[in-house]
Amino acid sequence: MKHFFKSLTLAIALAASVLFWSPQAQAYPFYAQQGYESPREATGRIVCANCHLAAKPIQVEVPQAVTPDSVFEAVVKIPYDTSVQQVLGDGSKGGLNVGAVLMLPEGFKIAPPDRLPEELQAKTSGIYYQPYSDDQQNIILVGPLPGEQYQEIVFPILAPNPGTDKSIHFGKYAVHAGGNRGRGQVYPNGEKSNNNVFTAPIAGTITSITPNPDGSTAVVITPENGEAVTETVPAGPELIVREGQTVVAGAALTNNPNVGGFGQKDTEIVLQDPNRIKWLLVFFAAITLSQILLVLKKKQVEKVQAAEMSF
């Protein structure tokens, strides 16, 4: 039943995306859910990079330390030039969308709405947070979102409590974040999107370039020996070749229309034991008191010595 509702959620999200976004390889972090048990490979690479081939920087901000059962915010920043437009699925130009994945330590999860302060409610308004799976609530997906409004994605996080969950322990943990702006270059099935460079499948001479009614272009390449091969270039990428031109296998037939990219960043967070902080404060207080007593004792000794010298 859980798997049914998960599939239903994905279907609704995809349907909404089709209604409100042009059909294209959007910044859909949930594509990874369908093909990967974990969004992070053994090498440390986040699987979103398999479809978003260009590398772009991101930033992630989390508190240095948090206490059990506390609510805090984690921020994934996805900067880019908002004046730039990307190629949409129909070949037209439009704004970039963004998406993010946040991999937290075990036990951390999205905070329930009734635990959010007003300021955090305002920062997270309009954002839908989705766990990677039913048993991986600590891995959170967001997107696609319009990049003009969400270059900073705020995650409201609830820290676990080792006092009530014995599987959780105090200590330092790794946090992994990934974020992308713009469409992917490859679909999950391995097929190129129209946000990619199209290349010559064989070496030969371009004998014809014919526009198709759907906006795509048929490029026919004839080798010296053998049959001609047709490469269909979808609407969007711009052709950089002409009829009669000789090309080698793998040569670019179009420009690279991609203006986006994916990035990932690692950081750390400490689940701090409040009792440890209390004992640390007691220790500092004891040290301070000892120093004060030593100073007072020293002054007392100096007074006695001064009194003895006066006789």
UniProtKB/Swiss-Prot annotation:
Cofactor note: Binds 1 heme group covalently.
Membrane association type: Single-pass membrane protein
InterPro entries, sorted: Cyt-f_TM, Cyt_f, Cyt_f_lg_dom, Cyt_f_lg_dom_sf, Rudment_hybrid_motif
HAMAP family: Cytb6_f_cytF
Source species, domain of life: Bacteria
Gene name tied to this protein: petA
Annotated protein name in UniProt: Cytochrome f
Positions contributing to heme binding: 28, 48, 51-52
